[in-house]
Swiss-Prot record:
Gene3D superfamilies: 3.30.54.20, Anticodon-binding domain, Bira Bifunctional Protein, Domain 2, Threonyl-trna Synthetase, Chain A, domain 2
Subunit structure: Homodimer.
Name of this chain's protein: Threonine--tRNA ligase
Residues noted as binding Zn(2+) in the record, renumbered to the chain: 302, 353, 479
Length: 611
């Protein structure tokens, strides 16, 4: 873990009370016992399903980081009533302490057993397995192709620490042209207390769901008529996006970057040169023909920055060159994987590319780490998980350059003082990289920033610079994204704040609540003053009673509600209610203006006025 100790801004309490003592919820990959429990529970579920639904054919049933699932080919979808019946069947199996045993068989024996059970999907799985073939039996009547591991018997599973959570559609092998299956998701833990904490966190995650908040606060939408995965930013959301972009640009100018704007499409020949058609074609939208030339929407900004570099002769004296762009890219995503702002087909990537000398790598990476911390901490992301991925077996590039690049990344992380894990051999074939995950207010980790060295594109595009001795040399190219996708970051940020955005970022910062018609002119005058001061303010002109005015403002999560009555109008003041700080009492208009301007300039969470 790394990053400052400053705590994330708190938001409204969860609807379900947290336990008095914290309950640790390990991931499956962090606990060998939990892995066995969840893997075994998926088998128990499959056995219970086939006992209740003899026509159901089994496919695969792996563990996940928070539970397990199993995909079934069944004539009908599973209902809520079915899940309850399946759970009862699972409890019976658990209580019987049925043994799970590993058995090695020949391929012919496995094929005979599979055909006897009429399990066509298992037959297909068998074709891809290498000898020896292992089965796990669950009692005498049920078995599955499986490498394990599992618990010794079902009595080691806690019947009070699991739940069947939901049903979803899936395709065999993830291929939409193949059979549609029915997936049952479940979760399993060692103790009932862990299950209760898991449920509480799920409930809290639902409360924070950016899709619901985006609709409630009128921030964005995805319109079916336009197409899946294409985001419409509404005025309130667009205002927030503009604030984020303005801060991003300012931070980059101060960090020594210049900005680029590049096209949304390019001739197909560019994508051939870059290698995208060889390695990324499935994620690209198909070509369009214009004036007898084929064009494709860009899935990445990198080749455009490379062409900009290649547009003129470069000298070593110019390096490092730092270019950044908020570039809209388009990637084909299958219908089943799109999710709100988190997974879309058109999004804005905050791409930057640094072209530098080999000896400049460490300094440039450190500058990127500093800029990353500055930007992420402004949105109250202060705890990071960092992975350094090194050279894989199959790679391109000179050994000395790989060593220099990897040492440069390590040196920068050490100079920054950030802890990191090394993923040996986990880098791309064209260079080592740093991946940074951010932790949100409820402990979830999100992949966010990436720093990637690239020895591939400079070679493909024959990039060079004139060295001090007059020779032509290849520059080092560093890809870098801090937000990654701006849309995805907006979704993560929204869930982190639960829609209670800090004052500087809120789409509507102050709402004026005149309690009578007589004070309306005063409210209009105050609105002008706030607007002139750069404060995003509105007046509620509905004429509702004060209680409803306040409730409406709170539902829209307005940071500051300013109540205006006759007394406030006479005193050139307002009565302030802050979502963050509660009742602030009566404040002079001059004090409100001063506090709001200061909060905006400092990108502060609240007004800083004391009640």
């Amino acid at each position: 873990m790394a990053g400052p100790d400053r705590k994330p801004v708190s938001s409204a309490a969860a609807t379900t009370p947290a336990p008095s003592a914290p309950v640790v919820l390990p991931k499956t990959s962090e606990s060998s016992q939990l892995l066995k429990i969840r893997h075994s529970m998926s088998h128990v579920m499959a056995m219970a399903v086939q006992q209740l639904f003899p026509k159901a054919r089994v496919t695969i049933g792996p563990w996940t980081e928070s539970g397990f699932y199993y995909d079934f080919d069944n004539p009908d979808p599973f209902t809520e009533a079915d899940l309850k019946a399946i759970k009862k069947g699972m409890i019976k199996i658990i209580n019987k302490k049925v043994p799970l045993e590993r058995v090695e068989v020949t391929r012919a024996e496995a094929e005979t057993k599979i055909k006897a059970q009429n399990e066509p999907y298992k037959l297909e799985i068998l074709e891809g397995l290498q000898d020896p073939i292992t089965l796990y039996t669950l009692g005498e009547d049920w078995w599955d192709l499986c490498a394990g591991p599992h618990v010794e018997h079902t009595g080691q599973l806690n019947a009070k620490a699991f739940e069947l959570e939901s049903v979803a559609g899936a395709y065999w092998r993830g291929d939409e042209t193949k059979a549609q299956l029915h997936r049952i998701y479940g979760t399993a833990w060692e103790t009932p207390e862990q299950l209760a904490e898991h449920k509480r966190r799920k409930e809290e995650a639902l409360r924070r769901d950016h899709r619901r908040i985006g609709k409630d606060l009128d921030l964005f939408s995805i319109e079916d008529e336009a197409g899946a995965g294409l985001v419409f930013w509404h005025p309130r959301g667009a205002r927030m996006r503009l604030l984020i972009e303005e801060f991003w640009r300012q931070a980059h100018f101060e960090g020594g970057y210049e900005l680029l704007y590049t096209p949304h499409v390019a001739d197909i020949s560019l994508w051939k040169t870059s290698g995208h058609l060889d390695f990324y074609a499935e994620s690209m939208f198909g070509p369009m023909e214009v004036d007898e030339r084929e064009y494709q929407l860009k899935p990445m900004n990198c080749p455009f920055h490379v062409l900009t570099y290649a547009s003129k002769l470069r000298s070593y004296r110019e390096l490092p060159i730092r270019w950044a762009e908020l570039g809209t890219v388009y990637r084909y995503e299958r219908p089943g994987v799109m999710h709100g702002l988190m997974r879309v087909r058109g999004f804005t990537q905050d791409d930057a590319h640094v072209f530098c000398l080999p000896e400049q790598i460490s300094d440039e990476i450190l500058k990127i780490l500093d800029l990353t911390e500055r930007i992420l901490s402004t949105f109250d992301f202060n705890t990071y998980e960092i992975n350094l991925s090194t050279r894989p077996e199959k790679s391109i590039g000179d050994d000395a350059v790989w060593d220099l690049a990897t040492k440069g990344l390590i040196e920068a992380l050490e100079r920054k003082g950030w802890k990191y894990k090394i993923d040996e051999g986990g880098g791309a074939f064209y260079g080592p990289k740093i991946d940074l995950k951010i932790e949100d207010a409820i402990g979830r980790m999100w992949q966010c920033s990436t720093i990637q060295l690239d020895f591939n594109l400079p070679e493909r595009f024959k990039l060079d610079y004139v060295a001090a001795d007059g020779s032509k040399q290849r520059p080092i190219m560093i890809h870098r994204a801090i937000f990654g996708s701006l849309e995805r970051f907006f979704g993560i940020m929204t869930e982190n704040y639960a829609g209670d955005y800090p004052f500087w970022l809120a789409p509507e910062q102050v709402r004026l609540l005149p309690v009578t018609d007589e004070v309306q002119p005063y409210a209009e005058s105050l609105l002008d003053q706030l607007t002139q001061a750069g404060v995003r303010a509105t007046i509620d002109r509905s004429g509702d009673r004060l209680g409803k005015l306040i409730r409406t403002g709170e539902q829209m999560k307005i940071p500051v509600l300013a109540v205006i009555g006759a007394k406030e109008a006479e005193q050139n003041a307002v009565s302030l209610r802050s979502r963050r700080d509660g009742d602030l009492g009566v404040a002079a208009v001059a004090d409100l203006l001063r506090a709001a301007e200061s909060a905006n300039s400092q990108r502060a969470a609240g007004l800083g006025l004391n009640g």
